[in-house]
A protein has these predicted regions:
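Hydrophobic ligand-binding cavity/cleft-lining segments
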Residues: 1-79
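Structured surface interface patches that mediate subunit assembly and partner/cofactor docking
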Residues: 2-11, 45-55, 95-97, 111-116, ...
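Intrinsic-disorder/low-complexity, polar/charged segments enriched in Ser/Thr/Lys/Arg/Asp/Glu/Gln
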Residues: 12-20, 86, 121-123, 134-138
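Short, hydrophobic/aromatic-enriched beta-strand segments in well-ordered soluble domains
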Residues: 33, 91-93, 139-143
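Glycine-rich, low-complexity intrinsically disordered segments
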Residues: 35, 39-42, 86-93, 104-106, ...
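Hydrophobic-ligand binding "helix-grip"
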Residues: 72-133
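Beta-strand/loop substructures that line and gate deep hydrophobic ligand-binding cavities in soluble
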Residues: 108-164
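A conserved amphipathic terminal alpha-helix motif
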Residues: 153-188
């Protein structure tokens, strides 16, 4: 059983990407935990584009100061970390809304217990496995919509963002790979 199955065994949407890394699983997973997508110009640009409607509405309503900072990994809750194996983040919300409709989860227990009609749950995992002297790094995103209404609302959003999401995932994996391999080079040089 994969760690993500503990948190989101049922889902209607899924996206999986992977890459090989010349570093030990523990180093790769640590690089994944340390990575911040907000440091990627493409990610920031796509999030800015995604948030244009929210920010425009706030400006029109004279509430520019009430708009949250740009979306990022800080919105996610770390659900579990198994060193050298996997880590899972969770996010809950109405992602199709201009403001993402996020519901703050304080803990893994809150995430597991949450079940509200009209509100989706997302799980994002990074898994590492050693394969022939390399580490296979895989990221999987799953989304569960608890009812027909949320499923119908989320579906067009998923198909709209999925191509960009795939590019972002590939860039994240590449950055984690580079950071992991650089850590090995730096460690070997000292």
């Amino acid at each position: 059983m994969h760690l993500i199955d503990k948190y989101l065994p049922e889902y209607g949407f899924s996206e999986i990407h992977g890459c090989d890394v010349n570093a030990a699983p523990e180093i790769v997973l640590q690089a994944a935990m340390s990575y911040r997508p907000e440091t990627d110009m493409f990610f920031r640009s796509m999030i800015a584009l995604r948030e244009v409607p929210m920010r425009a509405l706030a400006r029109l309503r004279g509430r520019e100061n009430s708009v949250a900072p740009p979306f990022g990994l800080h919105e996610f809750t770390l659900l579990e970390h198994r060193p050298g194996e996997a880590l899972v983040y969770g996010l809950v919300g109405q992602f199709w809304k201009t403001d993402f409709g996020l519901v703050k989860m304080e803990s893994a227990e809150d995430y597991l217990a949450f079940c509200t009609p009209g509100v989706a749950k997302l799980a994002l995992t990074f898994t590492v496995t050693e394969q022939g002297g390399k580490t296979r790094l895989v990221t999987e995103t799953r989304v569960f919509c608890p009812d027909r209404k949320s499923h119908l609302r989320f579906t067009p959003y998923w198909y709209l963002i999925r191509p960009v999401s795939g590019i972002i995932r590939s860039r994240i994996l590449n950055s984690i790979r580079k950071a992991s391999e650089t850590a090995i080079s730096s460690f070997g040089a000292s």
